[in-house]
């Protein structure tokens, strides 16, 4: 079965409408700057129906999942649960969550993160949405690749593997090691290109990532793949989708 290839659109319905054509789904950002009660649900449904596309969501980018303060952790669970309830109500299939903690290098926080992740995963399941936890180990509050993989396996949580993030953290070798050890957990991919000097979310082919490594591990992948390239140039987005499809043996 071919992978399902979509595009990330941030929190803008205008961008969603302008870029959706030709993609199987969109990944729409919610929370923080785009609270669910501010989203025009009817317009969202109409755009998706007209394009024949599905919906995934991205939970707040800067929201830590775990701290040492129980009251804050409870608030995080409640907040994410509310967003997931909305996501399920509008038919989202998956919800992406950054794998972050107040201090990801504090080993005492790891079991707390595991408990938080399991609770959010359960809330997603109750809403009819699959939670996927994303690697952001190149960022200050992101867990390192292997730690996130271990925590995802411990909690039975699916993974959103961001190829560019993994490269920024540990190069092509890091991509290879994570896929070798945890590839069976991956149901959602973020694809884009990067350069080690700090450029990220570039069109595939414009950076340094060896997508041959991705092909070795995910050839024939039948999950969801989101093109996360920061441009509104539709031709460029479609070219990255084509390149991703080639790497994954998915026809476009």
Model-predicted segments: where are they?
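Histidine-acidic metal/acid-base catalytic patches
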Residues: 1-2, 64, 118, 144, ...
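N-terminal pre-domain/capping segments
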Residues: 1-82, 158
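Acidic-and-aromatic substrate-binding clefts and catalytic sites of carbohydrate-active enzymes
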Residues: 8-16, 29-43, 63-71, 102-107, ...
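Acidic (Asp/Glu)-rich catalytic clusters
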Residues: 15-22, 37-57, 81-91, 115-126, ...
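Conserved, mostly hydrophobic/aromatic
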Residues: 26, 58, 76, 87, ...
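Short loop/turn segments at strand-loop or loop-helix junctions that form parts
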Residues: 58-62, 97-101, 192-193
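Active-site acidic/histidine proton-transfer and metal-coordination neighborhood
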Residues: 66-159, 251
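Short, structured patches in soluble enzyme cores that scaffold and shape functional sites
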Residues: 99, 133-135, 163, 193, ...
């Amino acid at each position: 079965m071919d992978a399902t290839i979509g595009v990330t659109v941030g929190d803008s319905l205008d961008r969603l409408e302008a870029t959706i054509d030709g993609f199987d789904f969109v990944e729409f950002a919610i929370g923080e700057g785009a609270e669910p009660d501010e989203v025009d649900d009817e317009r969202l449904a109409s755009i998706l129906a007209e394009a024949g596309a599905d919906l995934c969501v991205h939970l707040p980018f800067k929201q830590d999942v775990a701290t040492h303060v129980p009251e804050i952790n409870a608030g995080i669970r409640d907040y994410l649960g509310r967003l997931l309830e909305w996501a399920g109500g509008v038919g989202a299939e998956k919800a992406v969550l950054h794998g972050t903690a107040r201090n990801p290098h504090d080993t005492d926080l790891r079991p707390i993160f595991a408990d938080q992740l399991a609770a959010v995963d359960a809330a997603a399941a109750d809403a009819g949405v699959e939670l996927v936890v994303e690697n952001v180990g190149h960022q200050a509050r992101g867990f390192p690749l292997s730690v996130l993989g271990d925590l995802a396996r411990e909690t039975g949580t699916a993974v959103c593997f961001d190829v560019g993030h993994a490269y920024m953290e540990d190069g092509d070798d890091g991509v290879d090691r994570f896929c070798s050890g945890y590839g069976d957990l991956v149901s959602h991919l973020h694809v884009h290109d990067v350069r080690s000097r700090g450029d990220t979310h570039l069109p595939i082919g414009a950076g340094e990532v060896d997508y041959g490594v991705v092909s070795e591990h995910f050839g024939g992948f039948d999950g969801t793949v989101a093109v996360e390239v920061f441009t509104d140039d539709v031709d460029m987005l479609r070219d990255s989708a084509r390149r991703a499809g080639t790497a994954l043996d998915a026809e476009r």
